[in-house]
């Protein structure tokens, strides 16, 4: 099965990179988070993620160093590849760290449900009995 450009005829050149990063993450544990894929691909730096989690950035996209069309492609490829591996999409929960009330964190400037879900979903390897 070819993934990437939607028409089944060409493979997105970013797909092999996503496949490699997903394999690396799965070698360390059963969960793939798109945010971790973006960090490992150096699309966003760890210190920016920590600033966002602490409330220092109003939304995660503010710290992203790459173009948003590339980020969108990477999120889509991550989702497609993880589902092709049989990983189960599970809602991720991201809340502000630190003292005080734990507010949900925003990923995108717009805050629309589709964008938020693309960033926050986790893909989990099914448990085999």
Where are these regions (language model features)?
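An amphipathic alpha-helix signature
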Residues: 34-38, 75
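Long, low-complexity, charged/polar intrinsically disordered regions in eukaryotic proteins
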Residues: 1-5
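Intrinsic-disorder-associated interaction segments
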Residues: 7-11, 15, 64-71, 112
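Positively charged, polyanion-binding regions of nucleic-acid-associated proteins
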Residues: 11-35, 44-45, 50-63
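Phospho-regulated, low-complexity intrinsically disordered regions of nuclear gene-regulatory
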Residues: 47, 68-129
């Amino acid at each position: 099965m070819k993934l990437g450009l939607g028409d089944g005829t060409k493979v997105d050149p970013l797909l092999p990179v996503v496949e490699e990063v997903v394999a690396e993450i799965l070698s360390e544990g059963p969960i793939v988070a798109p945010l971790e894929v973006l960090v490992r691909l150096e699309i966003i730096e760890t210190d920016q993620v920590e600033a966002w989690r602490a409330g220092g950035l109003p939304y995660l996209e503010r710290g992203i160093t790459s173009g948003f069309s590339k980020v969108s492609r990477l999120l889509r490829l991550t989702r497609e590849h993880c589902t092709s591996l049989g990983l189960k999409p599970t809602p991720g929960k991201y809340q502000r760290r630190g003292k005080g009330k734990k507010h949900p964190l925003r990923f995108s400037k717009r805050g629309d449900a589709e964008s938020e879900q693309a960033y926050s979903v986790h893909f989990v390897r099914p448990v085999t009995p």
